[in-house]
């Protein structure tokens, strides 16, 4: 009976269930950015392409409307504001207000009865700049000592952010990457409207350095692997090789329970750093202050909480 399904972006933890929904009978409209549909390789004949650059809300019938904006998380990443004549809902998707590489349309001055808001890092108040500085504190001393840094990453997402971060702070560092990662980076260069000004040129310059050739020649300071959980045998082998040489593996995202990355962390063979590709608790609270959301559900963490706002004040209620 679902008429509309709003998909925020292409990452598997969001798009991966779509085919299952279809197999279970979903025949409604999929609302998503065209880039999301393409990168997630969705084949479906009822798609409404959401345009974050449109100056006008889009009507869906029966007095239902929505507007959207770029979420700063990845190519195709969106937030949605949905309303009808009675109620309204805001959904942040995976949101980051201060990205380096991705364009973001700031969420300010919006009102919603219900808001579902990214709060993936609830244990820190630090903003994106502060969290990025933590990662630099790992990378800098390591490469200064002649040791290599390995960063397992998703193919679409924070890899571009890390390229920008490394280029800005360690311009002389040689970056290598596996072929899967470089192919994905080349693919997203075709979506310039999702990148901040100047970043497409920076990323193309990175590709012209032929990072996969540096990997073949074994000449590099930092290795980017397009395999978040190190599930591919070649990526696991490369990580283990650099660990044996005294290198450092930095985990910047979600850890799959029982996986190889979890084993590395448990054995203190890797370190974990919060990368600001989602919101911290500080970001989350700032977003609430900048908008009028009556009931707020934080997501992307294991907590069960609701936040309520009334007359400029806020309160929190745990759900057990």
Show which residues each predicted segment covers.
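N-terminal start-of-domain structural block
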Residues: 1, 56, 191-217
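His/Asp/Glu-rich metal-coordinating catalytic cores
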Residues: 1-6, 11-157, 164-174, 200
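Conserved residues at the C-terminal ends of beta-strands
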Residues: 8, 33, 118, 178, ...
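Short, acidic/turn-prone active-site loops that include or flank metal/cofactor-
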Residues: 35-37, 55, 95-97, 120-122, ...
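Short, charged, surface-exposed secondary-structure boundary motifs
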Residues: 40-42, 100-102, 125-126, 184-189, ...
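Short, glycine-/Ser/Thr-/acidic-enriched flexible segments
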Residues: 73, 96-97, 121-122, 156, ...
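Binuclear metal-ion centers of metallo-dependent hydrolases, dominated by the metallo-beta-lactamase
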Residues: 128-201, 283-320
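C-terminal regulatory/interaction regions
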Residues: 168, 205-320
